[in-house]
Amino acid sequence: MGKTKEDILLTALRLFARDGYEATSTGAIAGALGMTKAALYKHYQNKRDIFDHIVMRMEELDAARAREQEMPEDTLEKTPEAYRRTTMEAACRYSKAQFDYWTGDEFAACFRRLLTLEQFRNEEMSRLYQQYLAAGPLGYMTDLFALALGRDRQEASALAAEFYGPMFLFYAVYDGAEDPAAVRKAAHGQIDRFFQNWRRNNEISTQSEV
């Protein structure tokens, strides 16, 4: 993707995250870029086309991050073996990388804020919010704990909620924080403690079975 196309996507996303999708016009996007609407339409057909490409870009980045962190890229139904092979060390690294990505990467942070802002106004935005920030991550971790740790679905679901609940909260805290670095440190610490507690409890359980 060329630089101009990337610039259009990021600029549009900034405006969507600040003003909302419906309230942002193609004229506003073009004006923020210092170009005419005619020039903008040479790259994207309309505002909807811009948004569709933003979502496509997020899907690409999502898969790339999972691949880089040695985590399952697809669903449990399609790649069950990838879930079984995943280590808790990899899950810990990935979780911290995800927090940094959703808060520190401008493209991802703006996308998150857009979905948070629009989830109650637009059914599609609500679905994307659930996919990327709520039910999607919770289900992903449930599947991971079920196969990687050999837990039943009920226990895996409880573990996933115990893990992801604080992480989800830290996203909201980060956005209004006077000291974002301190929030990042606290979020990373919470993730580390979760996996440390899991290892400790797992060792105790293993010893009691001997």
Model-derived features: positions:
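Short, Lys/Arg-enriched anionic-surface-contact patches
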Residues: 1-4
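Helix-turn-helix
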Residues: 7, 11, 15-57
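Short, basic, alpha-helical segments at the C-terminal edge of helix-turn-helix-like DNA-binding modules
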Residues: 56-62, 69
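Hydrophobic alpha-helical connector segments
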Residues: 66-105, 159-160
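Short alpha-helical scaffolding segments that buttress acidic/His motifs in well-ordered protein cores
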Residues: 98, 112-116, 163-167, 194
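Amphipathic alpha-helical packing segments from all-alpha helical-bundle domains
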Residues: 103-116, 120-150
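Hydrophobic/aromatic-rich alpha-helical bundle segments in the mid-to-C-terminal region
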Residues: 127-131, 135, 145-193, 203-210
